[in-house]
């Protein structure tokens, strides 16, 4: 059983304590009502995995845990089997005591693009919206964050996060809650808020930007990473039924349009930090994610287009500040 009591105790003593007015009831309702049919199987993998304390832990350059002496073949096989029970692994990679989880996405590449543009994370309290399996939470801790909180309603991601946490010595500096942004009150408590790979899934993108703003302290920093198209500040792609085989893609603005949206929502010092095309080296099928990936979503005769004929995915990073 995945419990959240440690997180409640942690925030009871800090500036997030007012979250306890709503959070425990929301989590209790989730535990009663909303569990996926495979959740028991996934949570068993978490329960059966041994808690391990790394002899060497690197969260600054990667997410890597090592033991002082190599694990036995039996120990490695047990860890490998339990981790594979939580497939597909989409965001990573992780290197855990000799088991290398080669995830669909090279999320470390995204982090390398984002990190140089951020305010120093040392001592910061951070919220990562749509955090997936929590890979970037650990990298935020590695960059000096005091506390990194991720929210993502996908229950497989919660189990993946908790299993990694056990292998990192039950580290309590990062936490993942199975919630969506719409379930959070206006906490106004985070120094930095990340939203990476979420905006294009929102039916109302400007409402999402307001929700992110409501989580920031005054002078707090927003890090927004999302799909974009080429064009001026009035360019927005509204895909039909699917975009790159994804059904739930609603609005893909140009980077200048997205900058304008952020300014319309009251953010200041908005800047476009990075724009790059997503490659099939960054997102691809692996032995830890064996179904279709980006190569299957692009036109085989013209890799600059999706199978639906839209521009192939490119992603932008924008940085903004709440006044």
Curated annotation (Swiss-Prot):
InterPro entries: CmoB (IPR010017), Mo5U34_MeTrfas-like (IPR027555), SAM-dependent_MTases_sf (IPR029063). Pfam families: Methyltransf_9. It catalyses: carboxy-S-adenosyl-L-methionine + 5-hydroxyuridine(34) in tRNA = 5-carboxymethoxyuridine(34) in tRNA + S-adenosyl-L-homocysteine + H(+). SUPFAM superfamilies: S-adenosyl-L-methionine-dependent methyltransferases. CDD domains: AdoMet_MTases. Carboxy-S-adenosyl-L-methionine binds at residues 91, 105, 110, 130, 152-154, 181-182, 196, 200, 315. It comes from the Bacteria. It is an enzyme of class 2 (transferase). GO terms for biological process: tRNA wobble uridine modification. One of its GO terms (molecular function) is transferase activity, transferring alkyl or aryl (other than methyl) groups. Keywords: Transferase, tRNA processing. Its EC number is 2.5.1.-. Catalyzes carboxymethyl transfer from carboxy-S-adenosyl-L-methionine (Cx-SAM) to 5-hydroxyuridine (ho5U) to form 5-carboxymethoxyuridine (cmo5U) at position 34 in tRNAs. Belongs to the class I-like SAM-binding methyltransferase superfamily. CmoB family. NCBIfam families: PRK15068.1, tRNA 5-methoxyuridine(34)/uridine 5-oxyacetic acid(34) synthase CmoB. PANTHER family: METHYLTRANSFERASE (PTHR43464), TRNA U34 CARBOXYMETHYLTRANSFERASE (PTHR43464:SF95). Homotetramer. This is tRNA U34 carboxymethyltransferase. It comes from Salmonella gallinarum (strain 287/91 / NCTC 13346). The gene is cmoB.
